[in-house]
Swiss-Prot record:
<comment type="subunit">
    <text>Heterotrimer of A, B and C subunits.</text>
</comment>
<comment type="similarity">
    <text>Belongs to the amidase family. GatA subfamily.</text>
</comment>
<keyword id="KW-0648">Protein biosynthesis</keyword>
<dbReference type="Pfam" id="PF01425">
    <property type="entry name" value="Amidase"/>
</dbReference>
<dbReference type="InterPro" id="IPR023631">
    <property type="entry name" value="Amidase_dom"/>
</dbReference>
<feature type="active site" description="Charge relay system">
    <location>
        <position position="74"/>
    </location>
</feature>
<protein>
    <recommendedName>
        <fullName>Glutamyl-tRNA(Gln) amidotransferase subunit A</fullName>
        <ecNumber>6.3.5.7</ecNumber>
    </recommendedName>
</protein>
<dbReference type="GO" id="GO:0005524">
    <property type="term" value="F:ATP binding"/>
</dbReference>
<feature type="active site" description="Charge relay system">
    <location>
        <position position="149"/>
    </location>
</feature>
<dbReference type="InterPro" id="IPR000120">
    <property type="entry name" value="Amidase"/>
</dbReference>
<keyword id="KW-0547">Nucleotide-binding</keyword>
<dbReference type="InterPro" id="IPR004412">
    <property type="entry name" value="GatA"/>
</dbReference>
<keyword id="KW-0436">Ligase</keyword>
<dbReference type="InterPro" id="IPR036928">
    <property type="entry name" value="AS_sf"/>
</dbReference>
<comment type="function">
    <text>Allows the formation of correctly charged Gln-tRNA(Gln) through the transamidation of misacylated Glu-tRNA(Gln) in organisms which lack glutaminyl-tRNA synthetase. The reaction takes place in the presence of glutamine and ATP through an activated gamma-phospho-Glu-tRNA(Gln).</text>
</comment>
<dbReference type="GO" id="GO:0050567">
    <property type="term" value="F:glutaminyl-tRNA synthase (glutamine-hydrolyzing) activity"/>
</dbReference>
<dbReference type="GO" id="GO:0030956">
    <property type="term" value="C:glutamyl-tRNA(Gln) amidotransferase complex"/>
</dbReference>
């Protein structure tokens, strides 16, 4: 079950050329994205040139699995010669002089970059309402949010603008939008993909991820972008087929841990979807075992102390001097810094910078930042202890279906959207979200989390689940291939 393999067959048979396929997707984006606002920069000329190159490779019989396959990139991955904005006024005119490792790996395998995707500014947000380029709409219901921060990545794939897209996940930013848009998306183990050329939010949490309809496509793409990178000291080498090595194996020996206390207070329709999903895993031979997950509210508090601190440090570089927005009315250097940052950053980014600077202040450091780091270590140890008993932990990907735009503009209520996804980021563990049912006629997702670098177990489990139970009901008509 793979859109990538379907497109590969069409390209190899000559049914369609890479240029024709690219033109189809570009036409659909031009016609339909006005309603969704998922694209910041459309790379039409570049895409057609890459498609021509792909056709030449195919004609020579030297193609790989991904040659000529279209892709869209979240607009925080640097792309040489194409602007990279991070959805911020601060970087509105920034054109990167180099490619991120993620985008370079895609180019090296002959993929066609269609464009750069909308997102919450600097990846800070859970709704994609915090973008300098406007909010993104959910293709399932245009009045609702697609989730965030990778909302454009999710909305574009759900709308059929590309078969696959990249995203980033700092606290759930690929998994929560996947849940809201009926997609499969994965945050791999911290260090399995390079962060070089990815605009930084919180460096010890950030990780590149992939969106697709099918888990097999997500696994194929993660194999494509993963691996060692000399420019990222936190990136470790994983073997070439790390994510796809076990996709054909059954899951009859797997043990899934479930904390019932995390499910009992969910809306009834989501509880029903969770129950049905666990029953389906049992039918595939997996064992369901009761476990106790660390307090999620403590995880949320820990996350919203450490990540703003890291963000404050990472965003200190944007001062209007070397690159980025520069206020034209500043009369001296101090005023240039102050006015450029005041005008260049949006409200949510400024909020998190202020929180970060507060918790890092010498008078508050021990009370907040130091304690949060200690708690992070304790929670990571507690979660890893659970994996001595189980292969994976199942949780919802979000406490609700997609909500209406403007419903959660209060920061605290918006932050609670990440409550189920944050534990994987705190502990650096892999986690995959996949569609499991509907609530109020909108898709909802489940989530599996595994031990560090056991990513292959997650892709195996979800591929087998989708092979037996299908996901056609979660694919909108306009996105079908």
């Amino acid at each position: 079950m793979s859109y990538i393999k379907k497109l590969r067959a069409r390209l190899d048979s000559g049914e369609i050329s890479a240029v024709e396929l690219t033109k189809e997707y570009l036409a659909k984006i031009k016609e339909q994205d006005k309603r969704i606002n998922s694209i910041i920069t459309l790379c039409e000329a570049e895409a057609l040139k890459e498609a021509e190159d792909a056709d030449a490779i195919i004609s020579a019989g030297k193609q790989g699995l991904l040659t000529g396959i279209p892709i869209l990139h979240k607009d925080l991955f640097c792309t040489k010669g194409i602007r990279t904005t991070a959805a911020s006024k601060m970087l509105d005119n920034f054109v990167a002089p180099y490619d991120s490792t993620v985008t370079k790996n895609c180019k090296d395998q002959g993929m066609v970059t269609l464009g750069k995707l909308n997102m919450d500014e600097f990846a800070m947000g859970s709704t994609n309402e915090y973008s300098y380029y406007g909010a993104v709409s959910n293709p399932w219901d245009l009045e609702r949010v697609p989730g965030g921060s990778s909302g454009g990545s999710a909305a574009a794939v759900a709308a059929g603008f590309a078969p696959i897209s990249t995203g980033s996940d700092t606290g759930g930013s690929v998994r929560q939008p996947a849940s809201f848009c009926g997609l499969t998306a994965m945050k791999p183990s911290y260090g399995s993909t390079s962060r070089f050329g990815m605009v930084a939010f919180a460096s010890s949490f950030d990780q590149a991820g992939i969106f697709g309809h099918y888990a097999e496509d997500v696994a194929i793409m993660l194999d494509a972008i993963a691996g060692e990178c000399e420019f990222d000291s936190t990136c470790v080498g994983v073997k070439q087929n790390h994510f796809t090595q076990d996709l054909e194996k059954d899951i009859s020996s797997k043990v899934i841990g479930v904390d019932e206390s995390l499910i009992k207070d969910l809306p009834a329709q989501i509880q029903e979807a969770v129950s049905k999903t666990l029953d389906n895993f049992k039918k595939l031979g997996a064992e369901i075992k009761s476990v106790k997950v660390p307090d999620l509210k403590e995880a949320l508090s820990t996350y919203y102390i450490i990540t703003p601190a890291e963000a404050a440090a990472n965003l200190a570089r944007y001062d209007g001097i070397r690159y980025g927005y520069r206020n034209p009315e500043a009369r001296d250097l101090d005023e240039l810094y102050r006015k450029s940052r005041t005008d260049g950053f949006g409200a949510e980014v400024k909020r998190r910078i202020m929180i970060g600077n507060y918790v890092l202040a010498s008078s508050q450091y021990d009370s907040y930042y130091n304690k949060a780091q200690q708690l992070r270590k304790v929670m990571t140890d507690q979660i890893n202890q659970i994996f001595t008993q189980v292969d994976a932990i199942f949780m919802p990907a979000s406490p609700s279906e997609a909500f209406k735009k403007g419903d959660k503009l209060d920061p605290v209520s918006a932050y609670l959207s990440d409550i189920y996804t944050i534990p994987a980021n705190i502990s650096g563990l892999p986690a995959i979200a996949f569609p499991i049912g509907f609530a109020n006629n909108l898709p909802v997702g489940g989530q599996l989390m595994a031990k560090a670098f056991n990513d292959n177990i997650l892709t195996q489990m979800v591929v087998q689940y989708q092979k037996h139970y299908g996901i056609e009901e979660f694919i909108l008509q306009q996105a079908r291939i």
